[in-house]
């Protein structure tokens, strides 16, 4: 592999009331390959090795056990169900001063779930692979009418959002029934929606142009939240498992 480094010298001169420009350039071809490794600074290499070993130990810490490999795919999947269920059930405890005591519906984007969760030991590195972004847990108070606007367009966007706490039935491609926590969605009711700031700010168009009654941004990333909750599940003597359910029902015709 070769890279050409050009040093360009610009000479500007003024003569007889006009501008005269002279351009000169020099180049040198440098071979960029393994021969450069011989010039590594020993002190720098020692520092990098130490940091690499430290990071490997931290990411390799086992925090739980997964019974079967969990994959993510739309409109609902074992892994997306697991992640949104944990978010819906446990996120109120991370609200801090907001003192939020419940979650009606949790929403994540499929694009933010970047890896599967393989069967066997779960490491911190596995969770970083699933959720590598610095997205913060966000709490939203939202009227049923606005929530319905968001939910009915999930299919229009190719089922780009995963959720927990809701059930949507589609007939002939259109949402015919929406339930929140087992009850029909009420347009005038205020619901507590928990998501990540990427989505709350309009990411992937999931909640774009949706009006909120109020929002609260936590200081906890979804990744750190997930790591802590998997540790808690493990401490309680349980392993990680998930399966499909009826949160998304698609009927081809009436």
What are these regions (language model features)?
Residues 19-25, 54-63:
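Generic N-terminal amphipathic/basic segments
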Residues 57-74, 206-210:
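Acidic/histidine-rich, surface-exposed loop or edge segments in extracytoplasmic proteins
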């Amino acid at each position: 592999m070769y890279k050409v480094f050009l040093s360009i010298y610009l000479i500007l001169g003024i003569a007889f009331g006009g501008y005269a420009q002279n351009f000169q350039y020099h180049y040198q071809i440098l071979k960029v390959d393994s021969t450069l490794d011989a010039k590594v600074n020993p002190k720098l290499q020692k520092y990098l090795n130490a940091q690499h070993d430290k990071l490997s130990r931290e990411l390799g810490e086992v925090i739980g056990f997964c019974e079967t490999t969990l994959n993510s795919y739309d409109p609902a999947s074992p892994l997306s169900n697991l992640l949104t269920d944990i978010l819906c059930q446990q996120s109120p405890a991370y609200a801090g001063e907001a003192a939020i005591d419940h979650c009606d519906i949790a929403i994540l984007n499929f694009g933010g779930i970047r890896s599967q969760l393989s069967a066997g030991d779960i490491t911190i590195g596995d969770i970083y692979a699933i959720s590598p972004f610095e997205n913060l847990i966000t709490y939203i108070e939202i009227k049923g009418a606005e929530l319905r606007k968001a939910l009915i367009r999930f299919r229009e966007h190719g089922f780009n959002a995963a959720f927990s706490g809701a059930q949507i039935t589609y007939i002939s491609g259109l949402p015919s029934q929406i339930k929140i926590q087992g009850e029909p969605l009420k347009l005038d009711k205020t619901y507590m929606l928990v998501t990540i700031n990427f989505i709350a700010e309009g990411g992937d168009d999931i909640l774009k142009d949706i009006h909120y009654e109020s929002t609260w941004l936590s200081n906890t990333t979804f990744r750190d939240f997930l790591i802590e909750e998997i540790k808690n599940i493990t401490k309680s003597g349980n392993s990680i498992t998930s399966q499909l359910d009826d949160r998304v029902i698609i009927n081809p015709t009436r």
